[in-house]
């Protein structure tokens, strides 16, 4: 992918954990939906009962079984329209369906169902509030997600799901110590895949890869279903991929696909490994299958960048045009995509627009991911001194992210800080020489030029 493309994809996926795990947990807690079996969930291993008497435990879900559950709940509500818990369950299911299908038109449906639940039962309705927090996270409104999660936890302080969603929002807002506290509370209430995967990501953000690996291994060990195991194996593969370990990454993705072939991020993992190994036909096949089945913008961008790297310009432009169509669809359904599109725009010729998007986002939240995108947009519009400030901030936690080091290295080179640029570009390629279909070769070329150029 481009300079920040794979990182953008990972950001989108990680933000999606809030939607996926949160809504799965809520759906699993409603008897009207029944046992929602299948694959693609992120369920924890232990079921507890929250303060309002509903089971606070996730369930594995597929698009098909979820669609059936939605239809079942809709029929029930036509017969019993005053059933406020079922309206909350329906709202959570719509949020989950949006994530599984990459169709944001489910978000307004979720909004309506949750509003109906609260209208019927305005006091003490932690179910609807937690679902609203999950909806806000799905729309990338993390300030709203935090506010709603806190409101739900004020009613039910023993909701592990509530603490998980709160922690997710805090991570996206750049409030990392507070996020750690929320995840620890979640882990105290219900240790399992949901809490371990979140703690793993927080460790990864801080550059603590042994802890991140350990927590994901715990997530895998406690996975109560093949679907949950597939989820854990995907992120174990991501840890290996982001460290440049192709063999382990491939093994984890393949294990995950054997465990849960319907979990489509695993297909993306396999495709990028195939691309890195030069298995062009297999990579093209898997990327095409991926975007056909789950046309989320991050996957379409990644596929387009791979096509660009193969000099298939017309095919790549068709994918990039699809990104613009999807952008409009997401925005009209209330989804904030400024962060994701800022990196895409910066790398694909719309640098002024990228700076506007990144500036808007950095005023909303100060996570290291936002600061990295802002730094890159500043650089691409010629503001390198300011860009370096934010590139330093992006790496302040110690995250071992090749794209971030590449961005800072390019900025340093533009400022004539040659030795620092060489160090950062070398680090980027040492972390993962395949970190981007487009930027990794650029990093290698720039490093070679700087290394062989006269020093000032």
Sequence positions of predicted segments:
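N-terminal leader/linker segments that initiate helical-solenoid repeat arrays
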Residues: 3-127, 147, 433-434, 441, ...
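Short coil turns that delineate tetratricopeptide repeat
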Residues: 81, 122-123, 157, 190-191, ...
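Start-of-helix register in tetratricopeptide repeats
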Residues: 85, 92, 126-127, 161, ...
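Canonical tetratricopeptide repeat
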Residues: 89, 131, 165, 198-199, ...
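Residue-level recognition of tetratricopeptide repeat
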Residues: 92, 99, 134, 168, ...
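Register position in tetratricopeptide repeats
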Residues: 96, 103, 138, 172-173, ...
């Amino acid at each position: 992918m481009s300079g920040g493309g794979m990182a953008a994809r990972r950001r989108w996926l990680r933000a999606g954990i809030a939607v996926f795990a949160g809504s799965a947990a809520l759906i699993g807690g409603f008897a009207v939906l029944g046992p929602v079996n299948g694959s693609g969930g992120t369920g924890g291993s232990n079921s507890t009962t929250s303060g309002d008497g509903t089971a606070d435990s996730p369930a594995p879900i597929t698009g098909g079984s979820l669609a059936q559950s939605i239809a079942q709940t809709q029929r029930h509500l036509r017969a019993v329209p005053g059933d406020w818990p079922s309206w909350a369950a329906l709202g959570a299911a719509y949020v989950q369906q949006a994530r599984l299908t990459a169709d944001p038109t489910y978000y307004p449906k979720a909004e309506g169902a949750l509003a109906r639940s609260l209208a019927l039962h305005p006091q003490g309705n932690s179910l609807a509030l937690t679902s609203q927090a999950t909806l806000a996270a799905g729309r990338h409104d993390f300030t709203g997600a935090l506010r709603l999660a806190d409101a739900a936890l004020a009613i039910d302080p023993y909701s592990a799901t509530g603490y998980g969603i709160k922690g997710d929002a805090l991570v996206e807002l750049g409030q990392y110590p507070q996020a750690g506290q929320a995840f620890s509370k979640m882990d105290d209430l219900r240790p399992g895949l949901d809490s371990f995967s979140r703690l793993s990501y927080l460790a990864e953000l801080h550059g603590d890869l042994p802890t991140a690996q350990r927590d994901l291994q715990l997530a895998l060990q406690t996975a109560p279903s093949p679907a949950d195991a597939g989820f854990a194996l995907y992120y174990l593969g991501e840890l290996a991929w982001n460290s440049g370990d192709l063999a382990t990454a491939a093994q984890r993705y393949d294990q995950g696909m054997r465990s849960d072939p319907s979990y489509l991020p695993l297909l993306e993992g396999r495709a990028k490994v195939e691309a890195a190994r030069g298995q062009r036909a297999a990579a093209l096949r898997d990327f095409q299958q991926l975007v056909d089945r789950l046309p989320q913008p991050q996957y379409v961008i990644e596929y387009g960048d791979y096509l660009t790297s193969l000099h298939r310009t017309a095919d790549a432009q068709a994918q990039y045009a699809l990104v613009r169509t999807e952008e409009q669809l997401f925005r009209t359904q209330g989804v904030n995509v400024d962060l994701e599109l800022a990196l895409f725009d910066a790398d694909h010729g719309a640098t002024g627009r990228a700076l506007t998007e990144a500036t808007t986002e950095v005023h909303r939240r100060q996570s290291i991911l936002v600061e990295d995108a802002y730094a890159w947009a500043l650089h691409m519009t010629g503001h390198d001194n300011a860009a370096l400030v934010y590139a330093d901030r992006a790496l302040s936690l110690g995250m071992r992210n090749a794209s971030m080091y590449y961005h800072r290295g390019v900025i340093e080179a533009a400022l004539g800080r040659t030795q620092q640029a060489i160090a950062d570009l070398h680090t980027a390629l040492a972390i993962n020489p395949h970190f981007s279909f487009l930027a990794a070769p650029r990093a290698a070329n720039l490093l070679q030029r700087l290394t062989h150029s006269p020093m000032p």
